[in-house]
Amino acid sequence: MKQSKLLMPTLRDIPAEAEVKSHQLLLKAGYIRPIAAGMFSYLPLAKRVLNKIETIIREEMDKIDANEMLVPEVLPAELWQRSGRYETYGPALYKFKNRQDRDFILGPTHEETFTQLIADEIKSYKKLPLTVYQIQAKFRDENRPRFGLLRTREFIMKDAYSFSADQEGLDEAFHNMEEAYTNIFDRLGLEYRAIVGDAGAMGGSDSKEFSAPAAAGEDTIAYSDATDYAANLEMAKDFYERRSATAEQLALEKISTPNEKTIDDVATLLDKPKNELVKTIMFVADDELVAVVTTGDFEVNEVKVQNYLHADSLVMAEEADVRKAVGAGFGSLGPVGLPEEVKLLVDERAADLANFAAGANEDGMHYVNINWNRDVDLLAENVSDFRTVREGDLAIDGKGKLQFTSGIEIGHIFKLGTRYSKTLGAQVLDNNGRQTDVIMGSYGIGVSRLLSAIAEQKADEDGLVWPASVAPFDIHIVPINMKDEDQARVAEQLETLLVAQGMEVLVDDRKERAGVKFADADLIGLPIRITVGKKADEDVVEVKVRASNTNIEMRVSEVVDSVSVLLNASEK
């Protein structure tokens, strides 16, 4: 393809609104353009990258016998009302009415749609297991879209759904999809980790995230420095062995703390380490007031709390509501004397304390020497891990310390179980002739997000550096002067030879200075650049490998074989 015919509007300056490297370069190199906050047009170069990503995905889906199909982006609200997500998904769900005053949504994901399809079409276990998928635009009304393609209101996603007659079928589908995702991300040339993830609004019992380490990543990944353990910070666990309190129980005492509002203030006043104090944080979980207690040196992990309660929503309680229910405001809360209507959850580290201090549920007052089951009834079923791990904590396997890094979520796989099939009536007759709920899995890849993830990991100070597997073109032929007959001849000859070998070639036939051409070539990041210059009359050209920025002079007759080898080396 001739570059003069390509819509590739490169920019000389980085737009001010672009905060991260991938956003800056995709704008500057003419890959994307914003049309509204969180909504982008994909220009020809970006569309070619997307096409190649989608091809790799389709090839790996074919290997596990997944069926590609397509369902509407606009969905009747009734399905989501039946599943319960119409209300619980939150303000990110686009809702609207048609001219007949019927409620509709723009799909952020399609569990309900595919489940209803299977409920209508599959009646016997003999038709299972089955995996279906689509590649399609999704919509999420993000409160604050940012970082280019990393957090948008419209995005492209591959979403797959497996349907099995039993748990073994789900486990096999989950394993097959995990292997397929590994193959996909390997072929894309990405560095990534498979980590323990949170199912979130999807529901389900088990999930695994695929995270690409990158400075622009909004997720914090906790990983062991000695083993392969890694988890999203929301789900990460540290190593802790429960122990029974053996200290002699001291007399409960209430003390005045009028100026101590934080755990640090109280620790200083009492001359106690923070791990001998507890903090009590109030939440509202599905309209129920919940008090969560942790030791003073840890923060409450809201995701763990919400998952433990199986709550559709969990938000921090308003201080006015807390004061009305408990009789005190923030800074003076504790587990002693809580009203019966307040559910008490206690982190396991806090549950093992004796003679500890906490707020007295009275402004400006604290208790010291609190002991469980003397001063506060503690139910074993309300004790669990409700804390957020810290960097340097011992990993859950006990073999390494936790380190933190930033990551971009590029894929997520879930074991949904019967969360949707039970609600939407997706049942089959089993081998005993009994009706049984279909067991489901859900599997997503952020296709458009992958553009940014690859750009974040592969770019350098000069521009983008695409792996050959997804580059918009394989080869960039750059004649210095198209008016020079030898250069024009060699450029055309090379294009013909390389295209005949099945390579995709971009020829810079523009009437621009050499410096402009080279800068644009580095910026758009094709794997191989062939410069046709002053030695064209000798049939000699310069081949540059973009990933390593190495230059090799060679004869035209050597180019095809050499470039094939170099491209294979540029796959990652």
Curated annotation (Swiss-Prot):
Residues passing through the membrane, by range: none
Listed PROSITE patterns: AA_TRNA_LIGASE_II (PS50862)
EC top class, as a word: ligase
Pfam families: HGTP_anticodon (PF03129), tRNA-synt_2b (PF00587), tRNA_edit (PF04073)
GO cellular component: cytosol
Keyword set, alphabetical order: Aminoacyl-tRNA synthetase, ATP-binding, Cytoplasm, Ligase, Nucleotide-binding, Protein biosynthesis
Enzyme Commission no: 6.1.1.15
Keyword Electron transport set for record: no
GO process terms (BP): prolyl-tRNA aminoacylation
Compartments reported by the entry: Cytoplasm
Chief location: cytoplasm
Domain of life: Bacteria
GO-annotated molecular function: aminoacyl-tRNA deacylase activity; ATP binding; catalytic activity, acting on a protein; proline-tRNA ligase activity; transferase activity
Annotated catalysed reactions: tRNA(Pro) + L-proline + ATP = L-prolyl-tRNA(Pro) + AMP + diphosphate
Keyword Nucleotidyltransferase attached: no
Job description of the protein: Catalyzes the attachment of proline to tRNA(Pro) in a two-step reaction: proline is first activated by ATP to form Pro-AMP and then transferred to the acceptor end of tRNA(Pro). As ProRS can inadvertently accommodate and process non-cognate amino acids such as alanine and cysteine, to avoid such errors it has two additional distinct editing activities against alanine. One activity is designated as 'pretransfer' editing and involves the tRNA(Pro)-independent hydrolysis of activated Ala-AMP.
HAMAP family registered for this protein in UniProt: Pro_tRNA_synth_type1
Family: Belongs to the class-II aminoacyl-tRNA synthetase family. ProS type 1 subfamily.
NCBIfam families assigned to the protein according to its UniProt record, in alphabetical order: PRK09194.1, proS_fam_II
Domain notes for this protein: Consists of three domains: the N-terminal catalytic domain, the editing domain and the C-terminal anticodon-binding domain.
Subunit and partners: Homodimer.
Protein name: Proline--tRNA ligase
